[in-house]
Each structure stands twice: as C-alpha cells, then as structure tokens.
C-alpha cells in the first residue's frame, strides 16, 4: 500500500503481523519494528523473508525510502539524509505509530543515525546494522583488498571515487560477492530488488563524499544496538566501533559477528536473529 506522508509524497509500506494480540483476558500491544533498507537506490526486498521470524515479537513495518522502489518518484532535491530521516517521523504520524523500534541496514543506518540526531526522543530503540558514519574510503579499499586482492581494491576505488553507471556496474559485477562470507541462501533474491541508479549515484557522488554522522549520535535518548560483521568490506568493523563509542554509554550496545560480512543475518542468521530477538524483547 502507499501512504501519504505530506506534501504530495507517498511511501510504499508493507505491514507484517498484528499490532494487538490476545493475551489472556486482555489485548496486548506489540512493539512496532520499522525496517529501513540499504542502498541508496534499492528497496526493502532484502528483508524478506528472513525478518518474518520476528513477527511473533513485533509488528513489522517495511517501507521503501522516498523516491525508492515502489514509493512515488520524487525530485532529486529531496534525496537527502535530512529528508529521509524526517520521513520516519512523517510515516509514524501517518500510521499512528508511537515509540517505534527503528532498524537501519547499511544506508538505512545512515538514515537512522541522522534520525537519532534530528529526532532523539522519537524511537524506543534503534538498531544500526552493518553501517558507517563517513565515507572512510581508505578503510573500504583496504578491506576489499583483503577480501579480493588488488583488482577488488581498484574496482572499489573507481566507483567510490568517481561514481558513474560504468564504474558501478564494473564494481557490482566484480566485488558484490565479497560483501558476504557465505553464498546467498536464495540466489534469486537479488533479482527481486528494484534498483534506481540515479539515486545511488546522486548520493554517492554528493552527500556521501563528505558524510560525518558521529557528532549527532551524542543526542541518543534510547537504547541503540550496533551490529557489525567483522569481515564486512563496505562498512568495516572500525566504523562500527567508532559509532558505538560516539553513543552515550548508558544507551549503547555492540554485537560483533566473527567471520561475517555485510548484513549479519545473511552470513550467521542464527546468531544475528538471537541478538535481535533479545534486544527487541528487553
């Protein structure tokens, strides 16, 4: 379904599971888990079907960021972290969601970090999964070289330094398999993802180049879980450790996954979902 969030913008939203469930002589309200996808330029498909296993704990709201996937096209002037972060609040207002648990994967984690800075009292909990706080080019290049040798480093250097359709296509064909340490459980999953390269190239060539999200993390006013695969080349371990250290000590939690790449639930779903279930239920 498409939800109006103001000023003519509509987001594609999919909801899994009831929010109210029978519990003896009463109806119990489950928390709402909002899942924000990576990219930018991709859609929410990567969360499905894996995240369905959390539907017993929380009502799950998947959505495509403004301009992405099945959401309405929007002008490039709206393709900014501030706008995408504010859209979380707009979407919650439209759906009547209060105190959500907000999960941001990769680029979705950039959005979640900006959301923490701009709306520190809005969430009940935040999960920052496989994300970074800056470009961190040299770390990326070193990580890709460790995983795939000099050729992988060169492909990463070309795309992240000079983003274009040509450099992205070469990069994606040459290093996408290095993002994770295990083969995809579903080889057809990538084909289900809707991709908008215009948004990807706009962001990587613009706001991403000078990205700096650490300072805003001191605004956190709720528990924040940082999840990181220790062998993630695109959002390296060091970035996650710096994100964790920038959060207020009373709110921060860290989950490291050895031998795991980008998106811990892909490479070690048993461990990753155990951590998520514990954090959601706390």
Spans of features found by a protein language model:
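Conserved alpha/beta-hydrolase catalytic His-Asp/Glu region
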Residues: 160-207, 216
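Active-site loop/oxyanion-hole signature of alpha/beta-hydrolase fold enzymes
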Residues: 56, 61-107, 274
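Catalytic histidine neighborhood in serine/cysteine hydrolases
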Residues: 245-263
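Flexible "cap/lid" loop of the alpha/beta hydrolase fold
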Residues: 125-158
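Conserved HGGG/HGGXW glycine-rich cap/lid loop of the alpha/beta-hydrolase fold
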Residues: 9-73
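Conserved alpha/beta-hydrolase "acid-adjacent" motif
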Residues: 233-239
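Short beta-strand/loop motif that positions the catalytic acidic residue
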Residues: 220, 226-228, 232
């Amino acid at each position: 379904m498409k939800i109006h969030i103001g000023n003519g913008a509509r987001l594609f939203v999919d909801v899994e599971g009831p929010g109210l469930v029978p519990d003896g002589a009463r109806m119990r309200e489950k928390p709402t888990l909002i899942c924000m996808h990576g990219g930018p330029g991709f859609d929410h498909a990567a969360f499905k079907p894996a995240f369905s296993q959390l539907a017993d704990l929380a009502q799950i709201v998947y959505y495509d960021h403004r301009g992405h996937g099945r959401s309405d096209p929007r002008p490039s002037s709206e393709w900014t972290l501030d706008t995408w972060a504010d859209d979380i609040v707009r979407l919650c207002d439209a759906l009547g969601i209060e105190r959500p648990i907000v999960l941001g994967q990769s680029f979705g984690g950039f959005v979640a970090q900006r959301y923490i800075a701009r709306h520190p009292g809005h969430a009940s909990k935040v999960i920052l999964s496989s994300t970074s706080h800056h470009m961190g080019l040299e770390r990326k290049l070193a990580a890709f070289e460790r995983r795939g040798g000099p050729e992988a480093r060169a492909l990463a250097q070309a795309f992240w330094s000079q983003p274009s359709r040509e450099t992205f296509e070469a990069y994606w064909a040459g290093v996408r398999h290095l993002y994770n340490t295990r083969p995809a459980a579903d080889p057809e999953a990538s084909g289900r993802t809707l991709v908008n390269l215009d948004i990807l190239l706009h962001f990587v060539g613009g706001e991403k180049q000078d990205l700096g999200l650490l300072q805003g993390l001191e605004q956190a006013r709720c528990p924040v879980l940082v999840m990181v695969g220790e062998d993630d080349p695109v959002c390296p371990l060091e970035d996650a450790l710096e994100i964790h250290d920038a959060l207020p000590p009373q709110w921060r939690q860290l989950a490291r996954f050895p031998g795991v790449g980008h998106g811990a639930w892909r490479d070690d779903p048993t461990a990753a979902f155990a951590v998520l279930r514990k954090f959601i239920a706390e």
